[in-house]
A protein has these predicted regions:
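Conserved small/polar residues in nucleotide/adenosyl-binding loops
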Residues: 174-176
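Early exported N-terminus immediately downstream of N-terminal targeting peptides
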Residues: 24-102
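Short beta-strand edge/turn micro-motifs at domain boundaries
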Residues: 137-166
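Surface-exposed, charged secondary-structure patches
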Residues: 96-138
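Bacterial N-terminal signal peptides
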Residues: 8-17
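Positively charged n-region of N-terminal signal peptides that target proteins for export
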Residues: 1-5
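Boundary at the C-terminal end of the N-terminal hydrophobic targeting segment
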Residues: 20-22
């Protein structure tokens, strides 16, 4: 009887403990933005910034999910080996494209404004890229994949209403 009580207690304890480590999507976005902003402000070469941005992207972006979304219905006609090769090529392309564009920014200030839980798998986080003398204020919405609350991932950026994932899909369609 004592073993059952102990087992019950441990199950409850660990389920509460594990759930307490889940990260809220808005905090995840602000943390990711802060990491990237700090990196972009560092006095290191552009190549070093690009390499470090790639690491941040690998940790925070659902590159595989975006890649297969980009592929669309064509994904169903590929065998496992072709899917694996496509995922590798897409990741390489995505990281190079993403990091080289982002490395051009210096000290971007992004403030998270709000979040809207769409369902168990997705939350939209609303933010603003603050205006500077060189650019106006820009509205950025982040589609966060929250199926695993301990590891939220960025699935899309919607910049001033334009979905980067959808744009990528249209570009992909033109080349496939």
């Amino acid at each position: 009887m004592m073993k059952k009580k102990l087992l019950f207690f441990l199950i409850i304890f660990f389920s509460i403990t594990f759930n307490s480590f889940s990260i809220e999507p808005d905090i995840f976005v602000q943390s990711t933005v802060n990491r990237a902003s700090k990196l972009l402000g560092e006095d290191i070469t552009k190549d070093k910034k690009i390499e470090k941005l790639k690491l941040i992207a690998k940790e925070t972006v659902d590159i595989r999910g975006i890649g297969f979304y980009t592929l669309g219905k064509k994904r169903k006609s590929l065998n496992e080996q072709e899917k694996k090769r496509y995922a590798e090529l897409f990741e390489e392309y995505f990281l190079k494209s993403f990091s080289s564009r982002l490395a051009e920014y210096t000290n971007p200030e992004i403030d998270v404004q709000s979040k809207e839980k769409l369902n168990e798998n997705y939350t939209i986080v609303n933010s603003i890229l603050k205006a500077t003398n060189e650019r106006p204020e820009i509205k950025i919405d982040w589609r966060i994949y929250t199926k695993n609350p301990d590891n939220p991932l960025i699935r899309d950026l919607i910049i001033e209403g334009l979905s980067l994932a959808r744009t990528q899909k249209e570009i992909g369609r033109a080349h496939v």
